[in-house]
Amino acid sequence: MSNLNYDFSIVGGGIVGLATAYKLQIKYPNLKILVLEKESKLAQHQTGRNSGVLHSGLYYKPNSLKANNCVKGREQLVNYAIENNINHDVCGKIVVAVNEVQCDYLNKLKINGEKNSLSGLQILNKKEFQSIEPYADGVSALWVPQSGIINYEEVTNSLAKNIVSVNKKSKILTKCKLLNYSNQNLQTNRGDFFSKHIIFCGGLFSDRLASSEVKSLDLQIVGFRGDYFKLKNSAKHMVKNLIYPVPNPKFPFLGVHFTRMINGDIECGPNAVFTFKREGYKKTDFNLKDTLQALSFSGTRKLFINNWKFGLNEY
């Protein structure tokens, strides 16, 4: 039975779950840690389905938790990548303004970034930013040298490897679905486990996991899918690194951007469209429970009423 007893159990095998487990294992090397992931491989959802960008912390409110986590997290991630020979590139990005109104917002972004400890930010004229991205067009651009690219699935798998190298008694279990839990007991399709502490890092199902503990939880995850286009090989030369638009301050999205992936591909995206299945990645994916729960939530209705025109354009 001792093999089924753990000090910490992490539910969720994305980068948040593995980073949490790794930090705990490094700080407390003698503790036994268990990571449970329902898929056959780690990092198969949000972690492995994004632009792969090392974000600088440019946009977030100064001194906020989000800003501090982004800046410190990026620095730690780059150091981890260097120490563990993970392919990455701190290549910088440009945020391009296409009119004078956006130029004013660009200056505000620069000030905001500097308050978040970003150095080397520069407002560039057209000639200057086209020396970085020759095919970009606009009035001016903000150069952000701290931005970069990485493969987060690779990072996640590296974290998993390092956890078990620190403590051979720790385990990373895939194809392991949580069926039920109470107090310190976890029931899964791969057996039952006892854990002194349980940490949920359940991604798109975090609210459902939390609601079983916090009955009065008034928050809910509403799923949005992002679609990407991949540039043809003949067009790859048109994007050197990262090209972003000036974001619309009314919405929590950075806008459709061009990204050089760490494998050399160039992607354009994402948009943001309501999805009828939480972990649905195709336009036709549908789950009745997910859909009804999202549409019955007052926050979803408010979002749709206030932003229906923007939403239609995303399709």
Give names to the regions the model predicted.
Residues 43-73, 83-88, 128, 275-313:
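Glycine-rich active-site loop/strand segments that organize a redox cofactor
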Residues 2-16, 34:
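Beta1/beta-strand and adjacent pyrophosphate-binding region of the FAD-binding site
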Residues 25-48:
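Glycine-rich FAD pyrophosphate-binding loop
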Residues 52-128, 138, 255-256, 265, ...:
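Dinucleotide-binding Rossmann-like beta1-alpha1 core, especially the glycine-rich loop
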Residues 19, 181, 188-286:
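Flavin-dependent oxidoreductases
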Residues 21, 25, 162:
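Gly/Ala-rich phosphate-binding loop of Rossmann-like dinucleotide-binding domains
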Residues 142-197, 201-208:
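Helical element adjacent to the flavin cofactor pocket in flavoenzyme catalytic cores
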Residues 16, 41, 205:
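Conserved Rossmann-like nucleotide-cofactor binding loop
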